[in-house]
Amino acid sequence: MASPTKPGTIEAPPAINSLSATQWTRPDYQLPVPSLQFLFHLECDMEDFHHIGQGPFGNRSTVIFKGGRFEGPRMRGTILPGGGDWEIVQDHDDIQTAHLNTRYNLQTHDGAIIYIQTTGTRTGKRSVLEKLGEDKSITPDQFRMRLNLTLESGDPRYSWVNDGVFIASSGRSGTQVIYDAYQVL
């Protein structure tokens, strides 16, 4: 198994030379390696945890967001109350994976509303993840939480978010979700 890429770096694809030229139509076609541009830092306050229980896809919970804040070079503002996370948790031996699915609204400092939806996973040792809501000493390097973000706005000042590709590195501390979002360029 290959070693993981060092955090903060992007691994370029290897040259295609393991197969004969007849198996590839364009082995010389060089695609650009994407880069990341910081979008914002976000801290979301959670409340009202509803444990629905074990269902056909895993252990489902709903978490309601009461608000929060975000700030970056191109936008800043607050998280409006009422959004939430509809997550499914699955246990595999001593590893736990939460499949995250959030929806909420951001309000920018200049009055625009941006709808945001995230999907992703939070995975790590079950003994660590089961303490996330209670133990603030757990650090982001003890588990992995990554998100894919979709942003939408009808405000012309933020129409650029409608066509963007966004990802985030995330974590949890007590009743907060914290993440740094990036635009993939």
Language-model region placement:
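Beta-strand-enriched cores of mature, soluble protein domains
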Residues: 2-185
